[in-house]
Amino acid sequence: IPASARLRGTIRAFRSEVIALLEERVRAISENIAAALGCTAEVTVEQVTLPVVNDAGVNERLRAVFQAVAPGVQLIRSFQTMAAEDMSYFLEAVPGTFFFVGSANPECGLDYAHHHPRFDFDEAAIPLAVELLAAAVASYVLPGAQPDHVE
């Protein structure tokens, strides 16, 4: 029987309060199980990133912009992912939104998940991504380019 054990994992959530609660619970459960067995537990939490939290107002603004510049594009409102991104730090400081431009293309065999060894993306999605990003910026910096005026 080994004298010590090491467990490692990742804690992710959609809200910072939930991450704090999970950290507290992991610590309490670990220490109490160890104490019940006559051992000690040391819990170290290294937070790598914050949750990515989009601003609802920015989301709605960009939704209108994207529908105006690319009316045929499918906008999925309910998609959630526990992305671990540097973007979370920007969104904590400034209202913004983090969005994906899908590129799956089953006809070309380009529909594997991001962490799959055969993942690749269809470069044909790049022009749409550029168009959406340019329209997003334009809606904030060009006079008259607000969503109800984008052509």
Predicted feature residues:
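Metal-dependent amide/peptide-bond hydrolase catalytic core
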Residues: 1-151
